[in-house]
Amino acid sequence: MISRRSTRQIQVGRVAVGGDSPVSVQSMTNTDTRDIEKTAEQLQRLQQAGCDIARVAVLDQDAARAISALVDMSSMPIIADIHFDYRLAIAAMENGAAAIRINPGNLGGEEKTAKVVAAAKMHGLPIRVGVNSGSIEKDLLKKYGYPTADNTQALIESALRNVRLLEKHGFEQIKISIKSSDVLTTVNGYQQLSKVTDYPLHLGVTEAGGLIAGTVKSSVALGILLNQGIGDTLRISLTRDPVEEVRVAFELLRCLGIRQRGPELISCPTCGRTRIDLFSLAEKVEQVVQAMEAPIKVAVMGCVVNGPGEAKEADIGIAGGEGLGIIFKKGVLYKKVAEEQLLEVFLAELRELEEEYQKKHNNV
């Protein structure tokens, strides 16, 4: 059982972050925020995938104003991502953003940052101090050098400097992120930061890459930190559809026993005994379980000889052979089905399990 680090708790809309609240999953839209229809559609898909909090880029006043319509169309808290222009932060808050993400060091000085803090206080909203290895102040780079796995001081000091600036103006509804594209720099940086602050931490590896590289890098870095009890909210950054970020995030949390959403799908890697198109079968089953909420374990195996035994912990599973497949529950044979009907019958069984869960869960 993982023991979470004790942190303060802040409220991002309806989602609590830090304290004893669950580790929340975030993503960021990749649409033009000013395109309300496309952005709202993406927010809806993110929420359906389980996303707790979404961030949108605010490039100008039109984007800030668009937040008002987006908030009306989505019950998910929306964070405004701000760079350089403090007026955009204020406008985003006025238009219903649940929080803002800034790097106070690039807002144009303390006077402008103070105006942002005053607006956040007035609206009762938190601020994320988000520092990336590529946005560190020049004097800190000169003093400490560029962040590496063995030297994360510039990242940490940049974050703490900006936190102190907010605190100076009486503001403490803060969460912090210090992101690098390097796994060990990210890990070591957050480990050191967690020792010197009790503000909630937003975990992430920036510019992680595509589906495979990004998933591996983020899972290694964030998995280490989460297993040490570090981290209150997270984003898996991928050069993909943002919905994939949410799916990877929940799979990571599931693997660590931190949080579960929907079914867990296990499948064998195939071998010479496989006599069916397991790749296609597993892909089609995965598409269905992604829309389910029942916290069950589903197995897709390629061999009727070893499949049920190897996946006996699964609540329900499927294994194929030559012309004949089987459906098993907890390793015990449940049905024999002709191969051409195997997928159809199995999906019907999955939908029945989901209906049972929904009836029980919703007290229907």
Swiss-Prot record:
Catalyzed reaction equations: (2E)-4-hydroxy-3-methylbut-2-enyl diphosphate + oxidized [flavodoxin] + H2O + 2 H(+) = 2-C-methyl-D-erythritol 2,4-cyclic diphosphate + reduced [flavodoxin]
Cofactor note: Binds 1 [4Fe-4S] cluster.
Binding site for [4Fe-4S] cluster: 268, 271, 303, 310
Alphabetized SUPFAM superfamilies for the sequence: Dihydropteroate synthetase-like, Nitrite and sulphite reductase 4Fe-4S domain-like
Record-listed E.C. numbers: 1.17.7.3
Annotated pathway: Isoprenoid biosynthesis; isopentenyl diphosphate biosynthesis via DXP pathway; isopentenyl diphosphate from 1-deoxy-D-xylulose 5-phosphate: step 5/6
Top class in the EC scheme: oxidoreductase
UniProt keyword annotations, A-Z: 4Fe-4S, Iron, Iron-sulfur, Isoprene biosynthesis, Metal-binding, Oxidoreductase
GO molecular function: 4 iron, 4 sulfur cluster binding; 4-hydroxy-3-methylbut-2-en-1-yl diphosphate synthase activity (ferredoxin); 4-hydroxy-3-methylbut-2-enyl-diphosphate synthase activity (flavodoxin); iron ion binding
Superkingdom to which the source organism belongs: Bacteria
Biological process annotations from GO: isopentenyl diphosphate biosynthetic process, methylerythritol 4-phosphate pathway; terpenoid biosynthetic process
Cofactor or coenzyme needed: [4Fe-4S] cluster
Biological role: Converts 2C-methyl-D-erythritol 2,4-cyclodiphosphate (ME-2,4cPP) into 1-hydroxy-2-methyl-2-(E)-butenyl 4-diphosphate.
Family membership: Belongs to the IspG family.
NCBIfam families the record matches: ispG_gcpE (TIGR00612), PRK00366.1 (NF001540)
Name used for this protein in its record: 4-hydroxy-3-methylbut-2-en-1-yl diphosphate synthase (flavodoxin)
Species the sequence originates in: Desulfotalea psychrophila (strain LSv54 / DSM 12343)
